[in-house]
Structure formats: structure tokens, C-alpha cells
Amino acid sequence: EKRKRGVEGMPQVWLLASAQALCASGSFLVVLLGGILGAELAPVPGLSTLPLAAMVLGLAAGTVPAAFAMRRYGRRPAFLASALLAAVACCLAAAAIRAQAFWPFCASAFVLGANNAVVMQYRFAAAESVAPERAGQAIALVMVGALVAAVVGPEVGVRSAELLAGSRFAGSFLAAGALYLAALAVLSRLPRDRPAIVDGRGGGRPLAAIARQPEFVVAVLAGVVAYAVMSFIM
């Protein structure tokens, strides 16, 4: 029975891996163009990298709401809503570039970062769809999608840069929006899942108790250092 569950869950894993490749492409596009466009749109040079910072802040801010949304409504609805919101954010970014509006562009980067918080849940959905002994393989396949995105995202951005005359790179974000819509179509093929049952009596340890654990502190510090280094390199 476990073997049957592992085999039956693999189509979902491939769907999630494909969606990961499509959605992560938008993030890599912000990494590629965020600093360049920030330098062009920012009112002062010191704010040039704010779009990249906004994306990272969006990721941090979206983590807890994403978890609550999936618990209340299920993974599939949360995935679909997030992909749609990311496509809208790409349209906002394109409009901001055409209007030479810095703050709306930063807002779009923030929303795309928040979408990343949902995209990071794809691997866990993949692990839950197969037998426990195949969870590692499922997670690895989804993570390969990010490697594909590292190539696809910048390539799409460069090739569609002049799509809209007079607004360099606005077309890049429209193309990214199309990728998010493609991800939406892929995610719509996932089977419907039931939200977690919340009875109001609570369960598990309080977040404060978890945060006091040495292991939690070490994990948070490692994440802070890793993202700080990544942001510095970007």
C-alpha cells in the first residue's frame, strides 16, 4: 500500500516541480533587474537596492500568513491565490516601470517576495503526497524546479526586455506574469485537499515555547546569516 501511495503521488510531485520552476523564475527576474531598475527609478541613489530588500521582507512577512491560509483553506487554494496575486504584482511592476514610479515597483517586489513564502511550501506538499520513504526524492524533484528557474527567469527577462517600446524591462515583468499564470494552470491540476480541522481548543506547543528552544534560535540565526549573505551578493 505504501508503494502504491508513493507511485500515485508522483504526478503531483511533477506538477509541483513544474510550478516551482515557473514561479521561481519571477523571483530570479527581480534579482536580475531589481538593482538596475532601482537605480533608474529611485529618488535617491541610496534606495537603489530597496526593491531587492522589499522582496526579502515580503518573504519574511508572508511566511506566517501563508501557513495560516493553508491550514484554514488547504494548500491548493492558497497556491492558486498566491500565483494569481503574483501575476497581478508583475503587471503592477510593468506599469510602475512605464510610469517611472519607484514605490509601486517596490510594492510589487514585496508581493512577489510574499509569494515566495507560499512557493517554499511546494516541497512540503510534495513530501506529503508520497509515501514517507519517498519524501526525500519528492522534495529533491521540486527543488530541481528552482534550478530550472535560475536559467529560465533571467533568460525570459532579457529576451522580453524590449517587448514594450519606450519602457525597457516592462515587458520582462509582463512575461513573468505570463509564467505565473502558467503556474496557476499547472497548480489547478492538483487534487483538492481538505483544510486542517481547527476546533478552537488549540494544539501543540505555543510559538513562544518553540522560540525559546536552542535549536530554534540556531536555525533562525543560520537563516538570518544566509539571507544576509544572499542579499549582499545580489
Range-by-range predicted roles:
Residues 84-99:
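C-terminal ends and interior cores of transmembrane alpha-helices
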Residues 106-144:
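Cytoplasmic helix-loop-helix junction between adjacent transmembrane helices
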Residues 2-10, 190-222:
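Juxtamembrane intracellular "pre-TM" segments in multi-pass secondary transporters
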Residues 10-11, 95-107:
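Helix-loop junctions at membrane interfaces in 12-TM secondary transporters
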Residues 157-158, 177-198:
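C-terminal membrane-cytosol helix-exit motif in multi-pass small-molecule transporters
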Residues 137-157:
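Glycine-rich segments within core transmembrane alpha-helices of 12-TM secondary carriers
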Residues 8-39, 110, 212-232:
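Pair of pore-lining "gating" transmembrane helices in MFS-fold secondary transporters
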